[in-house]
Amino acid sequence: GLTILYEDRDIIVIDKSAGLLTVKAAYEKEKTAHHILTNYIRKGSFKSTKQLFAVHRLDRDTSGVLVFAKSAEAKENLKLQWKNVRKKYVAVVHGILTEKSGTITSYLAENDDYEVFSVKDSRKGELAKTRYQVLKEAKRFSLLEIELLTGKKNQIRVHFSEKGHPLVGDDKYGKKGEPKSRLA
């Protein structure tokens, strides 16, 4: 699940495990970091009106640090500062990249099946930029440091899949038939 790393009167910072959703989805309403933490701040009382706000999200299969605000005001203050936060990830991808560093830029759109993909027309998608640096290479895999310059749904997964180097363990955008593993 999750581990609380820091808490004060305005925020809760957690380490989210892979496999846990950040917030509810149509198919899952209770096994989410938001639901677990809301119960925590309400101390199990259904009568409590305390609220919690996700400042950002991580994909279900991604582990990492998440920030939740304990008030709408705290959330808005954090959102205003969020563009100044550097978002870095480490991921293992299939193959050896010819360019050892670079920036992937595309416009991302989503279809009715919730699949995200790049489009050429800027009016049909949202700008997404991903900077990367190869840290290490093995025979069939590369370890990357990835920095999100924008933060769109499934951005890292889509960018590297479309580049021909899907994330190891990604059952949505990755290699079909690969044994399940975890993402970044």
Give names to the regions the model predicted.
Residues 29-37, 71-72, 110, 127, ...:
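Pseudouridine synthase
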